[in-house]
From Swiss-Prot:
Active site per UniProt: H544 (proton acceptor)
Residues that carry a glycan: N112, N184, N191, N279, N383, N416
Residues that hold FAD according to the record: L52, T53, E73, S126, N130, G131, S133, V273, G577, M589
Pfam family name, one: GMC_oxred_C
Cofactor requirement: FAD
InterPro entries per record: FAD/NAD-bd_sf (IPR036188), Glucose_Oxidase_domain_2 (IPR027424), GMC_OxRdtase (IPR012132), GMC_OxRdtase_N (IPR000172), GMC_OxRtase_C (IPR007867)
GO process terms (BP): secondary metabolite biosynthetic process
Name the UniProt record assigns to this protein: Glucose oxidase 1
Induction statement: Expression is highest at pH 3.0 and decreases by 58, 59, and 90% at pH 5.0, 7.0, and 9.0, respectively.
Amino acid sequence: MKSIILSCFVISAAASQSYLPTEQIDVQSSLLSDPNHVAGKTVDYMIAGGGLTGLTIAAKLTENPNINVLVIENGFYESSEGEIIEDLNDYGDIFGTTVDHAYEIVSQAINNRTENIRSGNGLGGSTLTNGGSWTRPHKAQIDSWEKVFGNKDWNWDNLFPYMQKAEIARPPNDVEIAAGHFYNSSCHGTNGTVHAGPRNNGEPYSPIIETLMDSAKERGVPTQLDFHCGVPRGISMIPNALHEDQVRSDAAREWLLPNYKRPNLQVLTGQFVGKVLINQTATSGAIPGYKAVGVNFGTNKNVNSNVYAKHEVLLASGSAVSPRILEYSGIGLKSVLDAAGIQQIVDLPVGLNMQDQTTTTVGSRTKPSGNGQGQAIYFATFNETFGDYAPPAHELLNTKLHQWATETVARGGFHNVTALEIQYENYRDWLVNEEVAYTELFLDTSGKINFDLWDLIPFTRGSVHIQGNDPYLRRFSYDPKFFMNELDLLGQAAGSKLAREISNTGGMQTYFDGETTPGSNLAYNADLDQWVDYVKQNFRANWHAVGTCSMMAEELGGVVDSAARVYGVEGLRVVDGSIPPTQVSSHVMTVFYAMSLKISDAILADFHAKSSKH
């Protein structure tokens, strides 16, 4: 196998702050699209996926000119149906285009419906398709990754500096502060890579946000806080991942464009990584060893090639795809692999522990006096969400954990009752003792009072598994098993009920001009049971799935260790959103960027340790 120094071309890194759409489209012509340029060759690190984590890690590794990296991405730099939607206010316009994977889930038992999971397909991944919300989780949640799940050094104090390192924060101006923003400079980074600041289209801000905060204060809810300091709670406006000119700050713009002029970085687009190439190494007793040596990639079973990795293969294809690559490679549950006709080499609970959230909408019209731009988040605690229904909800937490774990394992969402009960006990501790945010109510005031809301801490566990042995047919079962846990359904219903109440109480009555969703479809005095019935038929996925290649101790159900290395296979890591062992009370971009930087340091430490031995 021949080693190659990989190269490509880029416009000046100095111009990375402000690209015109035409300049962005020209980037694609500078990337590789012919697989023959890399087929049969060897690089130091092969990254499967050019999304948020893949591009971040590629940029960090290639800061060392002696490290050669190849990124293989299924998508391209821009959509074949038009350039990326740069205005975050219009992000939904890209759904259904070639930049949206639109994974179809299996029919859900709760309502016999299927839907598409929105996920970015292109360089930048879901940073091309999301709404850009920029928040961070609760300290206790990240601390549990070490304390509960055995991931050494994965705690708030260690991850927080990486969150700051990723960020170029733009403080709010006086007008934005008056509208409801708050900024604590000690919680932000200013010398990072991803731009984050207030969304501001130049129009006046709606008075609704300030009024909502005033009403919340009367109920003892904290307001106008910085949700980046480790305790997201209450109501405030938030920054978004965007430049000062309001252009999207996506992973391709910030991590690829300034760097792919490097002679040691190459990006191949329009190709799908099907499986990892794994060799058996020396046997230790009765247990054989295995090492990842490359990947097979292509477009179909008749048109595919191998490329080899001298050091490591890094899977960065996301929570829906990375577990499938592992399974096609012989890593996973025997029952799944046998059914697919694949020889198992390593037994790990790949594809289990999927944790996605569910979304409902409560929307109303505003009187003209309430018009204006603005978005805010209410991070509501468990008690705030349930209100008068909190006592029976607590009773469920105190009496049902073992039953829920048993039922979840029986449904195929996890594989070990005892280990899952530990997860559930951790979630109960968050909700009861730490008072982490349980529900996010996302308010948009652009001529309306619109709450999109979701249960942040689902107890339901789903799965994703391959169906067949040909990765290029992309046949798989994606099953979040929404609302198979009773508390999740009750929580989504209670959050929806809360959104209706706060839309039209106190000072909000000044601007409220009639509800549109649910509107007449649900009686205004509906009780929680009626809201449950409504939610069953009117929710959607939140598209934030994590956990399908969980990072935790192997005996707890881990697929990767605290350095993101796959158990039982040398030279193979999973480095994307499939590895967080828990959900968090946050939008996940900030966590994924910090993860990427921390894992990059681990990879580089191993590289330097190996180099020093030679």
